């Protein structure tokens, strides 16, 4: 005799016998319950037996008998306390219900099988298709938000560069000691920037004593070729890129 596997085989045989006996008693109790409550020979169909509210809310195995028959314990509960304790100790499980494609899959299946069963269901196909559309739209919204953020960053950088150029021009003019230079308010803002600051500019360029402003004599000697070139800065009807080019050229000049 194999004493090593004797306990396992005996325990498995006991569990199988117990499970078969539970199924048989369960079927007999259900059959008897149907015969009592659904017999067409009585005029009190459905009103013959009364059940407690607690039994109506419990599982089917707990409400197999009426409340009045407390002596018939076999019909009241085919799974008695001893059998229930044996089932708990033996860790016996009733067979699971058949898998439905509309329910949750068993936990012992892999994720791939679960995904296949969910996607193969005709009811879930439209739901998953609409979910894919929603996900695509969310990705597109994120992409557009990133574009807007990048454009805002570019605009902020351009604004800071223009501000630095403006401050450099104003500081250079004030350092030359232009006593008669009047800081006139810009009649129009730069294109694309809602600013209305006081620039040392007019719509024809830099002016000094109603004449176009030119460089001092020390710069004229060094840049004789540029003496006759006008230093007017035209910013009317110019794009942001052109304004930056004009300001950059004035910065280098």
Curated annotation (Swiss-Prot):
Record's protein name: Spindle pole component 29
Main location group: nucleus
Record keyword Magnesium present: no
PTM characteristics: MPS1-mediated phosphorylation at Thr-240 is required for spindle pole body duplication.
InterPro entries the record matches: Spc29 (IPR031392)
Family from the record: Belongs to the SPC29 family.
Biased composition (Basic and acidic residues): 69-91, 211-232
Location of Phosphothreonine modifications: 18, 240
Highest taxon of the lineage: Eukaryota
Subcellular location: Nucleus; Cytoplasm, Cytoskeleton, Microtubule organizing center, Spindle pole body
GO terms, biological process: spindle pole body duplication
Function field: Component of the spindle pole body (SPB) required for the proper execution of spindle pole body (SPB) duplication. Links the central plaque component SPC42 to the inner plaque component SPC110.
GO MF annotations, alphabetized: structural constituent of cytoskeleton
Quaternary data: Component of the SPC110 complex containing at least CMD1, SPC29, SPC42 and SCP110. Interacts with BBP1.
Ranges of biased composition (kind: Polar residues): 1-12
Residue ranges the record marks as coiled coil: none
Example of a GO cellular component annotation carried by this entry: central plaque of spindle pole body
Region (Disordered): 1-20, 31-123, 210-232
Gene it is expressed from: SPC29
Modified-residue entries (Phosphoserine), positions: 65
């Amino acid at each position: 005799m194999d004493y090593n596997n004797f306990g396992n085989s005996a325990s498995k045989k006991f569990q199988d016998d117990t499970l078969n006996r539970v199924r048989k008693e369960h079927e007999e109790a259900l059959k008897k319950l149907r015969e009592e409550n659904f017999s067409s020979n009585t005029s009190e169909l459905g009103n013959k037996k009364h059940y407690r509210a607690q039994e109506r809310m419990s599982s089917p195995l707990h409400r197999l008998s009426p409340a009045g028959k407390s002596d018939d314990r076999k019909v009241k509960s085919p799974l008695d306390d001893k059998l229930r304790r044996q089932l708990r100790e033996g860790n016996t499980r009733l067979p699971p219900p058949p898998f439905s494609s509309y329910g949750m899959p068993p936990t012992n299946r892999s994720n791939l099988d679960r995904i296949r069963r969910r996607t193969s269901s005709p009811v879930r196909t439209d739901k998953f298709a609409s979910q894919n559309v929603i996900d695509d739209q969310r990705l597109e919204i994120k992409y557009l938000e990133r574009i807007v953020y990048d454009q805002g960053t570019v605009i902020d950088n351009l604004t800071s560069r223009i501000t630095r150029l403006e401050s450099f021009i104003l500081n250079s003019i004030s350092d030359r000691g232009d006593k008669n230079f009047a800081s006139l308010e810009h009649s129009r803002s730069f294109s694309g920037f809602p600013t209305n600051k006081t620039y040392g500019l007019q719509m024809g360029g830099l002016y000094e004593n109603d004449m176009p402003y030119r460089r001092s004599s020390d710069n004229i000697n060094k840049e004789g070729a540029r003496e006759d070139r006008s230093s007017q800065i035209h910013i009317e009807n110019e794009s942001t890129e052109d304004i930056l080019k004009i300001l950059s050229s004035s910065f280098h000049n």
